[in-house]
Amino acid sequence: MLNNKGFDFWAGDYDKTVGISDEENTYPFAGYKKVLWFIFQTIMRAGNAVVLDIGFGTGTLTTKLYERGCSIYGQDFSSRMIALASEKMPNAQLYQGDFSKGLVEPLRNFRYDYIVATYSLHHLTDAQKSNFLLDLRNYLKENGKIIIGDVAFETRKDLEECKLKAGAVSYTHLTLPTN
């Protein structure tokens, strides 16, 4: 997995890379637009929802929700991704933090109609996912929902086999800046 510096480096081309993977129906973003559209429609049925996005990246989903009146909160560990998303959503409450360590303090002070995680939770181990999702329940409003749109497999071995079969692109070859 890329660290925050890797995602900072990738941020400028992230949307393009994801779009190509989705269009070519390749791992890991095959079906990306369909997943986001389903989540968008689900949230919009509730009207002006309060939404927390975990690992929001460049804000592809949350920008659409923001433009339609939702209150957006988010946590991402890439400062560059946050900067790009903030340009699109100047009044959103976006914070930097590694969600494998839980929510950052400011986000713990709110309750949400929806907590979404799209293409982010697969970076956690199964145990981390379980603990994190259990903790997130504490931040939902009554009748609130957690919606996950992500790459999912029954076992880690199944995931690795899928990557091999798909000829998945490895981003470990990126040359990162030294500063």
Language-model features and meaning:
Residues 52, 58-103:
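Class I SAM-dependent methyltransferase SAM/SAH-binding core
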Residues 102-110:
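Short amphipathic alpha-helix with an adjacent loop that forms part of the alpha/beta core around
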Residues 1-46, 147-169:
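Conserved class I S-adenosyl-L-methionine
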Residues 116:
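A conserved beta-strand element that flanks and buttresses the S-adenosyl-L-methionine
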Residues 130-142:
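A short glycine-rich, Lys/Arg-flanked "PGG" loop and its adjoining helix->strand segment in the class I
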Residues 172-178:
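Conserved small/polar residues in nucleotide/adenosyl-binding loops
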Residues 119-120:
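Short catalytic micro-motifs in class I SAM-dependent methyltransferases
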